[in-house]
Each structure stands twice: as structure tokens, then as C-alpha cells.
Design a protein with these regions (language model features):
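Secondary-structure capping and domain/repeat boundary segments
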Residues: 62, 132-134, 138-253
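Acidic, Ser/Thr
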Residues: 53-55, 79-94, 195-202
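Extracellular/luminal ectodomains and secreted, surface-exposed scaffolds of diverse proteins
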Residues: 33-42, 219-221
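N-terminal Sec signal peptide cleavage junction
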Residues: 24-27
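Bacterial N-terminal signal peptides that target proteins for export
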Residues: 1-13
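Bacterial N-terminal signal peptides
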Residues: 11-22
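Structural signature of tandem-repeat unit edges
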Residues: 8, 37, 42-45, 57-74, ...
Length: 253
């Protein structure tokens, strides 16, 4: 019996030592960056958004960046301490009564319930690709993609995904992401309220957003509006809104 207890004690000590060494090798730093609270682990070249700062809670629009301080943003939530795997957390501090829409620049994972305490959030825009999973939180919001990615992901029974109706183009050959810099979605007949961050291109200066590839007529975010809503009667005899794209093209100087 004593020998057995001794073995159990040794195993317990070894386990505790392993956990302590693991904790030491993965030292944690919690910092504020822009509108976000962020967690860094010294043993990983990644960053984890854990919540919003006080200023972040007052923003109507938020962009989830691809990188923070040179580290790829891989998750909204926590890292599993024991396995080191991603653990999207429903308890992350993403709380806001003001936030209306979230833009994902890259593929960052989370859960729909991550935003369950953002009572006014209605739209999530995926600039690159899908990166948020469904769960049983019962959060009601809509998800938007480029038309091409929407067609790939389209499910006739899914009432939450839509093609974005505002498409910002890099406007040069060989651009990444099929030439899309940004996408957005606003009601037809309305102004575009959110102006995306300025794109960058080596050797060039960004010169504004234009209505055609030749960059003749600049889009005025103060006065220009999207086309008026048009409807048609579908095969089931129901009225539905006709999808209309508004493409804006970057000018390079």
C-alpha cells in the first residue's frame, strides 16, 4: 500500500512539475491594443483578442485585424492551458451596446456566442474568408462575403449568409484576395457610413475610391448613396429584393 501511495505521490509531483514548466514556457502578457484587450503567450507567435477596452465599447464599427504587434490574430477567446489548442471562449469580454458591425480582415476563429453581449450587433463582414463558428447561443446576426465566396458557401436553408453589396477593388493586376480589398453592406438608397482603412501598395500612394476602374468620378462618402431598392416577384409569387453591386476602385498615384 505504501509503495502504491509513493508511486501516486511521485506521479502527482511529476505532473505538477510539468504543468509549472509549461506555464513558465508559455508566460502570459495581457495588454491593451487600440480598442482591444489582447493576450500574448511568449511561446507562440500569435495573439488572442480577449475583449474590448472602454473606448472599444463605444465604437459602432470594429475591425478585427490580421495582426497585432507582428503576431497573427488567430482567435477571439482563450488558449487551452493544458493542450495549447485554440479554445474560442464564450466568456470573452466582447461586450457593447453600441457596436453595430464587425469586420474580419483575416481568418480569425471564434464563436457566434462571442458576441452574445453585443446587443446592437447586426452584421459581420468577412473580408477574406469564413472564420467564425456557429454554436447554440441563439445570436441573431447576418454574415457577408464576397459574391464568389458566397456562391461557394451558399446553403438554401441558411438565412444568415449574404453576398455583400459594396465591393472595394484593389484595381491592379495580380492583387491578392481575387482583387478584393474590402467589402461591406448597406441598405439600398443609403450612404456608406464606414470608410475602410486606406489600402497600401508598394511604390504607390493611395488616391481615393472611384466609381470606375479608370478612376474618373470619385465616390463622395458625404453625399453619394447606393442605388435605390428594386424588387421582383420570384417563382413562389413572393416579392424579393434584387441584389445590386456597387463597386469602388482604388486610385494609385
Amino acid at each position: 500500500m505504501k509503495r502504491r501511495l509513493c508511486k501516486i505521490l511521485v506521479a502527482t509531483i511529476l505532473m505538477a512539475t510539468t504543468l509549472m514548466l509549461s506555464a513558465c514556457s508559455g508566460c502570459v502578457r495581457n495588454e491593451e491594443w487600440g480598442y482591444f484587450t489582447v493576450k500574448f503567450y511568449d511561446d507562440r507567435e500569435t495573439a488572442y483578442i480577449t475583449g474590448l477596452t472602454e473606448e472599444g465599447q463605444q465604437q459602432r464599427f470594429l475591425v478585427i485585424p490580421k495582426e497585432i504587434k507582428g503576431r497573427k490574430v488567430v482567435c477571439i477567446g482563450e488558449r487551452n492551458f493544458l493542450t495549447g489548442r485554440l479554445l474560442p471562449s464564450i466568456s470573452s469580454e466582447m461586450k457593447s451596446d453600441v457596436l453595430e458591425r464587425v469586420y474580419f480582415e483575416g481568418i480569425t476563429y471564434g464563436l457566434t456566442s462571442t458576441f452574445s453581449e453585443c446587443s446592437n450587433l447586426k452584421k459581420i463582414i468577412f473580408i477574406d474568408d469564413w472564420g467564425t463558428g456557429y454554436d447554440s447561443a441563439g445570436v441573431s446576426m447576418k454574415y457577408y462575403f464576397t459574391p464568389e465566396k458566397y456562391r461557394i458557401k451558399y446553403n438554401p436553408y441558411d438565412t444568415q449568409t449574404f453576398p455583400a453589396n459594396i465591393l472595394y477593388r484593389f484595381n491592379y493586376e495580380g492583387a491578392e484576395n481575387d482583387g478584393y480589398y474590402w467589402i461591406d453592406d448597406y441598405d439600398y438608397g443609403n450612404r456608406i457610413e464606414f470608410i475602410p482603412p486606406e489600402p497600401e501598395r508598394d511604390g504607390y500612394t493611395f488616391g481615393g475610391w472611384y466609381k470606375e476602374p479608370e478612376c474618373i468620378n470619385e465616390w463622395n462618402f458625404e453625399t453619394d448613396v447606393l442605388p435605390e431598392k428594386c424588387t421582383e416577384i420570384n417563382e413562389d409569387g413572393e416579392e424579393e429584393v434584387i441584389y445590386q453591386e456597387t463597386k469602388l476602385y482604388a486610385k494609385w498615384i
